[in-house]
């Protein structure tokens, strides 16, 4: 997926990281899994949102890429 295919908030954050306004995290996969875990564990969110986050996290964990 390319940044231009993402929502406005992601594109804005991407630009802020690229411009030095926000910090770059070299362990991006770890950061993503932690974020998906936070979303999946939040019982206040709709079940379908939590399941999508869990699916994304599980796929990242099963991938052969390591941070």
UniProtKB/Swiss-Prot annotation:
NCBIfam families: PRK04964.1. It holds the Pfam family UPF0253. Belongs to the UPF0253 family. InterPro entries: UPF0253. It comes from the Bacteria. This is UPF0253 protein PBPRA2947. It comes from Photobacterium profundum (strain SS9).
């Amino acid at each position: 997926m390319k940044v231009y295919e993402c929502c406005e908030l992601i594109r804005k954050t991407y630009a802020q990281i690229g411009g030095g306004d926000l910090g770059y995290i070299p362990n991006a996969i770890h950061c993503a899994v932690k974020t998906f875990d936070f979303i999946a564990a939040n019982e206040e969110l709709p079940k379908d949102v939590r399941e999508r986050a869990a699916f994304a996290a599980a796929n990242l964990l099963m991938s052969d890429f390591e941070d």
